Amino acid sequence: MTRVILFPAIDLKEGRCVRLVQGDMAQAIVFSDDPAAQAASFAEQGFSWLHVVDLDGAFAGAPMNAAAVDAILAAVTIPVQLGGGIREMRTVEGWLAKGVSRVIIGTAAVRDPAFVREAARLFPGRIAVGIDAKDGRVAVEGWAKTSTVTAEELGRRFEDAGVAALIYTDIARDGVLKGLNIPMTLALAQAVSIPVIASGGLASIEDVHRILEPDCALLAGAITGRALYDGRIDPREALAAIRRAEEARRSGS
């Protein structure tokens, strides 16, 4: 079992912190007008990483919420992983130079696998691949289009590339609080040796307990968004559960 990390999500749209329903920009729920303050709050609550997505950037193909991301980076000292609109090496270099700990490449991973491999070679441990699936196929361009590539096929492409993590999102479950798609996420984790992070649908503390069960030992963590903002998950309870699981693992119980 790898160390499990619970990532609070900050999705940026027009400089504000929002949550979408199944990736639909027309169904954006605004949770905060101050993403930096939200980031600082998550850090104070004890989270060890932040997951940030530039939603406008994902659709535009280039960064669109740079000011908000800069403010987040200035507000916290915990590591930040960032996705959305990262399709060129200069964008990767720019974000890493600004202090982003890990960048997430999504659309470009499907369209230009060589770009991902080169980025992982240049920046070892700092490149993740976002695998966003709709009906088993990988979606691209802010989930507006669906490719013919399956999640497992895409993951295997980067098996020996030095990618730090694969972030698997079930689009049908994203933002609707129906629970993580554990079977599909585990299928991906079993197909590759790269750490896999689950996303999309985490709804309750029971979902946190689920990823800590022995059969989910291959999972490196999960991303939580709406459940955290809605108060369905108590951060202290969730983080305490993870600590207990790690202590039990270390003691061999």
Curated annotation (Swiss-Prot):
Its main location: cytoplasm. Pathway: Amino-acid biosynthesis; L-histidine biosynthesis; L-histidine from 5-phospho-alpha-D-ribose 1-diphosphate: step 4/9. One of its GO terms (biological process) is L-histidine biosynthetic process. It catalyses: 1-(5-phospho-beta-D-ribosyl)-5-[(5-phospho-beta-D-ribosylamino)methylideneamino]imidazole-4-carboxamide = 5-[(5-phospho-1-deoxy-D-ribulos-1-ylimino)methylamino]-1-(5-phospho-beta-D-ribosyl)imidazole-4-carboxamide. Its EC number is 5.3.1.16. GO terms for molecular function: 1-(5-phosphoribosyl)-5-[(5-phosphoribosylamino)methylideneamino]imidazole-4-carboxamide isomerase activity. It is an enzyme of class 5 (isomerase). The active site is at 11 (proton acceptor), 132 (proton donor). SUPFAM superfamilies: Ribulose-phoshate binding barrel. Belongs to the HisA/HisF family. This is 1-(5-phosphoribosyl)-5-[(5-phosphoribosylamino)methylideneamino] imidazole-4-carboxamide isomerase. It comes from Methylobacterium nodulans (strain LMG 21967 / CNCM I-2342 / ORS 2060).
